[in-house]
């Protein structure tokens, strides 16, 4: 929880440092928005990872049922072509997630952090905090 100064406006940890211009605040806001989008991408990758694993295990039941129904050729094809298959050459989904996390995602987070440190003393969401101040409803219970 940040410390309020003057009762209205952003709390101290969301106030722009003295001398920080509007364009830089907007640029930091866009960089933060981009990172938030990449966070969503990461979540989708984890979803794909988990769903692919779930599908792979469901194939075991399909194979068993095809075998019981006398469709050995189809059961064997599923075993041969699908169960445990790399989703892209040389990679299971966990490897894709790890490479994303250790490469693109890690670098993206680091660049965003460095930009905040360099221009805003590490403060986050300055653009959004100021936007909140401009767009906040006039209701008395929304003054904080």
Pin down the residues of each PLM region:
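C-terminal-biased regions
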Residues: 2-68, 72-144
């Amino acid at each position: 929880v940040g410390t309020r100064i003057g009762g209205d406006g952003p709390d101290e940890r969301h106030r722009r440092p003295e001398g920080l211009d509007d364009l830089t605040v907007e640029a930091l806001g866009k960089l933060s928005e981009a990172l938030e989008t990449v966070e969503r991408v990461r979540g989708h990758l984890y979803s794909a990872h988990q769903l692919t694993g779930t599908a792979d295990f469901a194939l075991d039941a399909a194979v068993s049922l095809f075998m019981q129904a006398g469709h050995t050729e189809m059961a064997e094809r599923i075993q041969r072509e699908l169960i445990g298959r790399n989703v892209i050459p040389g990679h299971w989904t966990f490897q894709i997630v790890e490479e994303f996390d250790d490469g693109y995602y890690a670098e993206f987070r680091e660049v965003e952090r460095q930009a905040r440190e360099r221009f805003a003393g590490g403060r986050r969401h300055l653009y959004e905090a100021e936007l909140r101040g401009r767009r906040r409803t006039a209701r008395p219970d929304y003054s904080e």
